[in-house]
């Protein structure tokens, strides 16, 4: 690939090679799930791919989608996750966990965890979007109407956020 800085770089080239080696749905789905756990959401384990993670995730998603279409028949494609789980059962279990959540922080972790583990193409879109609706509704109920009235500094304190300034404020 031509070296054009951020849009084409050694990191992306390395991931293109890794992704090309994936030849089974099981391997590709597991790599996508682990990649999301390691490099996406506020709960990520690493920021090393900060400029490239969305591009890499999209390439992994493409690979999983192609392998899933080859591996599954039409019924399974529309009703099972890439791991072979019944999508409705997975969704029902996640919604039950969300409904049992006692506070907004627990609910946020459930919702984000669902996205990391099951965002399409892992879960069929029809189940995933219904899950997003149900989980998001419950999360907003737990956050309550005053969530957006809470000052930013108070939200940071509640979450244990430490602000780091890379340069001095003007």
UniProtKB/Swiss-Prot annotation:
Enzyme class (EC, first level): oxidoreductase
Documented EC number(s): 1.14.13.25
Record keywords, A-Z: Monooxygenase, NADP, One-carbon metabolism, Oxidoreductase
Keyword Transport: no
Catalytic activity field: methane + NADH + O2 + H(+) = methanol + NAD(+) + H2O; methane + NADPH + O2 + H(+) = methanol + NADP(+) + H2O
SUPFAM superfamilies named among the record's database cross-references: Methane monooxygenase hydrolase, gamma subunit
Biological processes, Gene Ontology terms: methane metabolic process; one-carbon metabolic process
GO molecular function: methane monooxygenase [NAD(P)H] activity
InterPro entries on file: Me_mOase_g, Me_mOase_g_dom1, Me_mOase_g_dom2, Me_mOase_sf_g, MethMoxGammaMmoZ
Lyase listed as a keyword: no
Pfam families: MeMO_Hyd_G
Subunit field text: M.capsulatus has two forms of methane monooxygenase, a soluble and a membrane-bound type. The soluble type consists of four components (A to D): protein A, comprising three chains, in an alpha-2, beta-2, gamma-2 configuration, is a nonheme iron protein containing an unusual mu-hydroxo bridge structure at its active site and interacts with both oxygen and methane.
Function: Responsible for the initial oxygenation of methane to methanol in methanotrophs. It also catalyzes the monohydroxylation of a variety of unactivated alkenes, alicyclic, aromatic and heterocyclic compounds.
Protein name listed in UniProt: Methane monooxygenase component A gamma chain
Natural source organism: Methylococcus capsulatus (strain ATCC 33009 / NCIMB 11132 / Bath)
